């Protein structure tokens, strides 16, 4: 028997039934792994915070404009240092967290902890799958990466964003706006695979660079014009509905939509033995 075909309708259902045991195992594992209530305060951040506090106290005692300007310069300098420094100790050994999410036979684990913790978690999952479910964990696909390095999951790239950009809050104070937030992107490779799956693109290489060219779909030549239009619209809409949460969705939709649009024009041109410029 060849098993359930990849991408088949029944595939996710069977995976959910069989891997339900893995879900329960991970629920119990998380309870044992999680540790601490909050990360400890970063000592360097606390140091700058105290220095800023002393400077603000000195501001009340400043008697001349020069003294006041000098103190304000110090306050601003410490504000800048605090914005560049994490307020919490990211490597606090007394604080650990594990998040687990699965769809069909793909799963992703997010770990707040050491690389050793991540290695142990991977080894424990591998052992459970082999002994309890008689499944083999793919070493090639199951990678341990830093949270700032994109991890591939369900066609997306997910990473923990490290960004020094700031914005002002309602009181005019500068705040870190994007640092350590989760960023979800559509990799160009996902767009490429989808277009190849629809058989609407021809990819050639020129001077080491890929050139994407839309192509006609001759299998649609005998379809009604409206059916062809609806087919393309449905595929474009389906791509957007799935990948719309990505931060770069607009850019990649432009790449995807352009190829799809001109593939449709070429399909109509082939159907009516005409040229794209006349469609």
Predicted regions and their residues:
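Non-catalytic terminal/accessory segments
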Residues: 1-279
């Amino acid at each position: 028997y060849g098993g359930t075909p990849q991408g088949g309708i029944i595939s996710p259902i069977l995976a959910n039934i069989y891997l339900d045991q893995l879900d329960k195992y991970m629920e119990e594992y998380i309870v044992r792994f999680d540790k601490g209530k909050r990360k400890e305060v970063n000592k360097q951040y606390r140091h700058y915070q105290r220095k800023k506090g002393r400077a603000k106290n000195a501001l009340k005692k400043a008697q001349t404009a020069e003294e006041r300007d000098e103190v304000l310069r110090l306050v601003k300098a410490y504000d800048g240092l605090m914005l560049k420094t994490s307020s919490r100790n990211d490597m606090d050994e007394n604080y650990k967290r594990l998040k687990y999410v699965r769809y069909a036979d793909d799963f992703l684990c997010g770990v707040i902890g050491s690389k050793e913790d991540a290695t142990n978690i991977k080894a424990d999952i591998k052992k459970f799958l082999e002994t309890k479910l008689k499944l083999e964990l793919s070493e090639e696909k199951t990678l341990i990466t830093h949270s700032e390095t994109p991890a591939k999951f369900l066609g997306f790239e997910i990473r923990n964003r490290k960004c020094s950009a700031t914005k002002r809050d309602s009181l005019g104070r500068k705040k870190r706006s994007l640092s350590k937030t989760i960023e979800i992107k559509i990799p160009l490779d996902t767009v490429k695979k989808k277009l190849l799956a629809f058989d609407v693109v021809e990819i050639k290489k020129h001077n080491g660079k890929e050139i994407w060219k839309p192509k006609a779909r001759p299998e649609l030549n005998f379809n009604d014009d409206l059916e062809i239009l609806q087919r393309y619209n449905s595929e474009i809409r389906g791509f957007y509905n799935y990948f719309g949460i990505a931060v770069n969705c607009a850019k990649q939709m432009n790449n995807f939509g352009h190829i799809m649009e001109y593939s449709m024009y070429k399909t109509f041109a082939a159907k009516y033995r005409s040229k794209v410029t006349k469609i």
